[in-house]
């Protein structure tokens, strides 16, 4: 029995030495030994081969259902006025004359049926479906047996992900999070000074780099000259808590976010000991006022870290950008927009908080192939003369969506948890009524107020 324990101890010692020497230490100094790059290149070749084999199998087996991309129906992208004009072609009339035709009803019937089948909102809160299988059963709805070789490759992938990568990633996650909790707690006892701020930044960025290695993260940063400066506000589209790890690998931030429980709550409480992060309860009005005051004080001090905010207020599945809350744009500071786009071939980064708790989500990430993403730093933006916070937020959101290749939606991500506001319905009613009574349709506005 003692011999077995000795062998186990030796194996553990060898394992930790390899992890520390080849991964943890290089990560702490921001150095890559190239293992992840080689792994990603090999993975790309494997997935390309699997895609070709699946396509050939679909030709050989006509009954095999084709993989569906995100979206199951094709919709017109035109405005209400454009689509109704198209319907009225058989009865050409001038909209400005205030005429009504019965065929107008077909437009609303069509839109209603489209939204019953597939609306623009709820599909943003579920995982993105892939056009081609990435050898993960969780991302393939229509998989059937195609060939022995493909099945063997899938089996080898399961072994690699669960028997090799998962233990390695759990080890790195434990090291990284332990470093964060212990390090921030110790730094928190120091008096406020430049040394404390430097140590806090060191603890945070080291933790994020180790955790990124634990996800086999490959991150490409573009336009680094536009990185957020101290005293500014960094806003980004939000897909998952991993967004923080991705951005903080390239610089430190003071963060603003919703209070969480469980593992996430432990991490939040430890982080705030050494750095002025702002955690709040969304349902508490007094918390909102306190957050607003702290944000104003923060951005007025040009020596403090840039604030990282996700104005959508919830996680979206990285296919679109939803409405930005105006609160982040009411302080008159410089906004540094950042677009984050994940490559879904290697793993689904979206956190469906209604379906998975934090631990379950992390395990899903650790059993994925890798996290591959692009980060674009956009030029800083400021509020223009005569521009209110709502229009400023929409302008920033559009810039992020355009750069990241995401769909720009005006809908509120809060619909994930609440019902549609009456104002949404009223805006559509106002637009149509302005058409049939002959008013200038541009007087009506579309989207949430």
Swiss-Prot record:
InterPro entries tied to this protein: LPCAT1-like, Plipid/glycerol_acylTrfase
Motif (HXXXXD motif): 238-243
EC number: 2.3.1.15, 2.3.1.51
Annotated transmembrane regions: 9-29, 146-166, 170-190, 358-378
Gene Ontology terms describing biological process: CDP-diacylglycerol biosynthetic process; triglyceride biosynthetic process
Membrane topology per record: Multi-pass membrane protein
Subcellular location: Endoplasmic reticulum membrane
Main location: endoplasmic reticulum
Reactions catalysed: sn-glycerol 3-phosphate + an acyl-CoA = a 1-acyl-sn-glycero-3-phosphate + CoA; a 1-acyl-sn-glycero-3-phosphate + an acyl-CoA = a 1,2-diacyl-sn-glycero-3-phosphate + CoA; dodecanoyl-CoA + sn-glycerol 3-phosphate = 1-dodecanoyl-sn-glycerol 3-phosphate + CoA; sn-glycerol 3-phosphate + hexadecanoyl-CoA = 1-hexadecanoyl-sn-glycero-3-phosphate + CoA
SUPFAM superfamilies: Glycerol-3-phosphate (1)-acyltransferase
UniProt keyword annotations, A-Z: Acyltransferase, Endoplasmic reticulum, Lipid biosynthesis, Lipid metabolism, Membrane, Phospholipid biosynthesis, Phospholipid metabolism, Transferase, Transmembrane, Transmembrane helix
One of the record's GO cellular component terms: endoplasmic reticulum membrane
SMART domains membership: PlsC
Pathway: Glycerolipid metabolism; triacylglycerol biosynthesis; Phospholipid metabolism; CDP-diacylglycerol biosynthesis; CDP-diacylglycerol from sn-glycerol 3-phosphate: step 1/3
Domain of life: Eukaryota
One function term, GO molecular function aspect: 1-acylglycerol-3-phosphate O-acyltransferase activity
Enzyme class name: transferase
Family per record: Belongs to the 1-acyl-sn-glycerol-3-phosphate acyltransferase family.
Entry's free-text remark on domains: The HXXXXD motif is essential for acyltransferase activity and may constitute the binding site for the phosphate moiety of the glycerol-3-phosphate.
Protein function: Converts glycerol-3-phosphate to 1-acyl-sn-glycerol-3-phosphate (lysophosphatidic acid or LPA) by incorporating an acyl moiety at the sn-1 position of the glycerol backbone. Also converts LPA into 1,2-diacyl-sn-glycerol-3-phosphate (phosphatidic acid or PA) by incorporating an acyl moiety at the sn-2 position of the glycerol backbone. Protects cells against lipotoxicity.
Protein name per the record: Glycerol-3-phosphate acyltransferase 3
Organism: Danio rerio
Annotated gene: gpat3
């Amino acid at each position: 029995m003692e011999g077995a324990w000795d062998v186990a101890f030796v194996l553990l010692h060898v394992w930790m030495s390899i992890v520390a020497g080849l991964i943890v230490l290089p990560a702490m100094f921001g150095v890559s030994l190239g293992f992840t790059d080689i792994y990603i290149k090999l993975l790309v070749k494997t997935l390309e081969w699997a895609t070709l084999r699946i396509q050939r199998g679909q030709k050989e087996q006509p009954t095999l259902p084709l993989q569906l991309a995100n979206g199951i129906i094709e919709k017109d992208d035109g405005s209400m006025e454009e689509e109704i004009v198209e319907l009225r072609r058989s009865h050409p009339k001038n909209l400005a004359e205030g005429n009504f035709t019965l065929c107008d009803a077909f437009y609303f019937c069509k839109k209603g049926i489209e939204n019953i089948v597939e609306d623009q909102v709820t599909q943003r809160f579920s995982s993105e479906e892939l056009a081609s299988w990435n050898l993960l059963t969780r991302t393939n709805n229509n998989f059937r047996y195609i060939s022995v070789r493909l099945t063997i490759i899938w089996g080898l992938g399961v072994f690699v992900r669960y028997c090799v990568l998962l233990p390695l990633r759990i080890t790195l996650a434990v090291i990284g999070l332990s470093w964060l909790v212990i390090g921030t707690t110790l730094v928190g006892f120091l008096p406020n000074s430049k040394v404390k701020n430097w140590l806090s930044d060191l603890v945070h960025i080291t933790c994020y780099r180790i955790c990124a290695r634990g996800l086999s993260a490959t991150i490409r940063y573009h336009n680094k000259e536009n990185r957020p400066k101290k005293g500014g506000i960094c806003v980004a589209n939000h897909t998952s808590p991993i967004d923080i790890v991705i951005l903080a690998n390239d610089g430190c931030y003071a963060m603003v976010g919703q209070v969480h429980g469980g593992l996430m709550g432990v991490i939040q409480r430890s982080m705030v000991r050494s750095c002025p992060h702002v955690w709040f309860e969304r349902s508490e009005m007094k918390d909102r006022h306190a957050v607003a005051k702290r944000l104003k004080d923060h951005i007025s001090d040009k020596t403090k870290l840039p604030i990282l905010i996700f104005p959508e207020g919830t996680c979206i599945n990285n296919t679109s950008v939803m409405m930005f809350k105006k609160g982040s744009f009411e302080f008159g500071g410089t906004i540094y927009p950042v677009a984050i786009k994940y490559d879904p071939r290697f793993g689904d980064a979206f956190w469906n908080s209604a379906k998975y708790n934090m631990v379950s989500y992390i395990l899903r990430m650790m059993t994925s192939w890798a996290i591959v993403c692009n980060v674009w730093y956009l030029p800083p933006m400021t509020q223009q003369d005569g521009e209110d916070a709502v229009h400023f937020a929409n302008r920033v959101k559009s810039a992020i969506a355009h750069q990241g290749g995401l769909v720009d939606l005006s809908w509120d991500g809060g619909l994930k948890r609440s019902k549609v506001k009456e104002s949404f319905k009223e805006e559509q009613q106002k637009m149509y009524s302005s058409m049939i009574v002959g008013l200038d349709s541009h007087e009506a506005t579309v989207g949430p107020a």
